[in-house]
Amino acid sequence: MNLYNTQCPVPKEQQPVHEYTSLKNSWFFCWPTLSRRSYNKKITIALLLNCLLVSPILLSIFPITKLPLKFFFSEFITSSLMTGFILIRLYLGWSYVVKRLMSATVFYEESGWYDGQIWVKPSEILLKDRFIGLYEVFPLLNKIKNTLSFLSLMISGPVLLFFYF
């Protein structure tokens, strides 16, 4: 029996559990739910696509024949920053959902922006939502944070070398 259907006045698309499942099933936000290998593959593909995207622009700024090191460093830095923005977007989406899952109250709108309501979760629903938040979503947030940390460490070397050369 779904507790949300019987006890909850919140519209289905605004219920925290529904938001969690819709994120988990979406094309982009499902990346952290994949296995470590598949997740790393997606991030690497995003990094390589960003490299291809910024190469023509950076070639016009740093000609590869005259400034090859500046070109390669700037390409790596720029594509890594763009990949970092992708990871930040993933993090923000999942952190919004975990905040709604962990909260004892749910803010919702019945028909528009002018009639917002607050619903206090019953203890059964609160326990279920917090369980999902702690054991399903927090590990995903940690995975994204670790990837962002690794990416920022990888960027630090080329940034210093960019200004040296």
Swiss-Prot record:
Cellular component aspect of the GO annotation: chloroplast
InterPro entries in UniProt: CGLD27-like
Subcellular location field: Plastid, Chloroplast
Coiled-coil boundaries: none
Keyword vocabulary terms for this entry: Chloroplast, Plastid
Disulfide bonds: none
Domain of life: Eukaryota
Family: Belongs to the ycf36 family.
PANTHER family, per database record: PROTEIN CONSERVED IN THE GREEN LINEAGE AND DIATOMS 27, CHLOROPLASTIC (PTHR34214:SF3), PTHR34214
Protein name: Uncharacterized protein ycf36
Native source species: Pyropia yezoensis
